[in-house]
Amino acid sequence: MTLNLRGILKENKMITWDEQTDVVVIGSGVAGCSAAIEARSAGASVIVFEKMKITGGNTRISDGGLAAPGNRLQKEHEIEDSPELFYQDILKAGLNLNHRSLARVFAEQGAEAVEWLQVELGVQYMDRLDRFGGHSVARCLTTSSHSGKDIVKAQTSRLKEMGVEIRTQCLLTNLLTDDNGNVCGVQIKTGYNHKDQGAKEQKNIRADRTVILATGGFGNDVPFRMLQNPNLDTTVTSTNQRGATAEGLSAALKIGAVPVHLSWIQTGPWGCVDEVGYGSGSRFASYALYPNGILVDPSTGRRIVNEWADRRQRSMAIFKAGHPCVGIMDAQGAGHDSQSLEKCLKTGKVYEFNKLADLATACKIPSDTLASTVEAYNNMIRKGQTDQFGKSLKTAQLISSPPFFAMHLWPKVHYTPGGVGINTDAQVIDVRNQPIPNLYAAGEVCGGIHGADRLGSCALTECIVFGRIAGRNAAAKRGGE
């Protein structure tokens, strides 16, 4: 089979299709796998291509957190929540730059997505709820292993049962279009090795119905992210897996997809100085330190931010200080993630002290000032006051029970809220806000849902919501005829 391609292959050469399927999915993280499961369930033949040697992308190395209003645990604990409250939290964190129709779909379908993962795929959650910065209530679930590996295993196992092949080490180089601008396939380099950028051969795969782009973000693509924000150079590390680069996004932009919010790049304020990427240190800071402790500038001994603020506000406060800051908590607060604490103590990511004065000395913090800071903070908690940063301390954790714990924090690039524009059907749109026929996208490769910044535990949930939408609509060839 041959087809005259426009604007992608040089000199409009007639090409030979090496293979064909109904739906091509690029990326094997939670967004891509959710899309593939739905497309196959709808009767389409599906092939998933993954550029790395292992499946899962950032999902695999995530902490397995999923935010959803009205989830089962909230009902059991009589926590009042709603899609509307979630929606408002999303807009606030996103500085109201969110594409509201997309944020609304996400907020309204989040609980269903989390339920689908458990009921249909067997993913289990811990018997705990967390309230991370920017969320109005505790609505964040975590997988039983405290890892996204549970999700990857469940989804890839289901795809195997369904007869869907995931081909690793296959790099997307081009999205192929016909003379009418309809996406009709992909160009893939097989045998791709991320370490040396090598590949064996190039293949053209025809998609008889649609292509779904689920290639994730570009947090580890330093040259590309510096084009968007020159401040995020090599001195700012990333929590992402090595394959979090911009090839998929670039391929879509090349055929006319509209870029949305590319310069808004999220940094995680819980970045642990004493580890590479996102490990037990960052996890401990996220799940225990920020919810139950304080963040102090070591040069002054004073707090610098509302520890429950969204990620952008906390990161900006640390960047403003100009050096790593110190997170401090007591034994009771640290107990909220005892599993991570044990790992962090063994690996030197968290330090333990019997006295607050010893902590101050070790972390080079003015001891008297730190003592005053902690005393003032505890007094406001006892009185149920709101502090100078707007943090309501009625339910905050006292810092009074030894031993005390400290860790050094500096933001790391964690998430890229910007990407290709999509509509509520997960169709990729062009600069005229019109769908590019036969091209869908889901997950971090998309922009607009989160606006300027994303709330914690929202990435996986959002990937499931729009991955499922993309898969169902792609299989039906919705909007592509």
Residue ranges, per PLM feature:
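Extreme N-terminal leader/targeting segments of oxidoreductases
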Residues: 1-23, 41, 449, 453, ...
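N-terminal Rossmann-like FAD-binding beta1-loop-alpha1 element of flavoenzymes
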Residues: 23-48
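Conserved N-terminal/central alpha/beta ligand/cofactor-binding core
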Residues: 3-6, 10-13, 45, 51-165, ...
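A glycine-rich dinucleotide-binding beta-alpha-beta segment and adjacent secondary-structure elements
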Residues: 174, 369-453
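Hydrophobic, small-residue-rich alpha-helical packing segments that form membrane-like cores
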Residues: 148-157, 173-202, 210, 219
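Glycine-rich loop(s) and the adjacent beta-strand/alpha-helix scaffold that form part
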Residues: 193-194, 198-202, 206-274, 466-469, ...
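An anion/pyrophosphate-binding glycine-rich loop and adjacent beta-alpha core
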Residues: 249-369
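C-terminal structured subdomain/cap of oxidoreductase catalytic cores
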Residues: 17-18, 204, 337, 342-344, ...
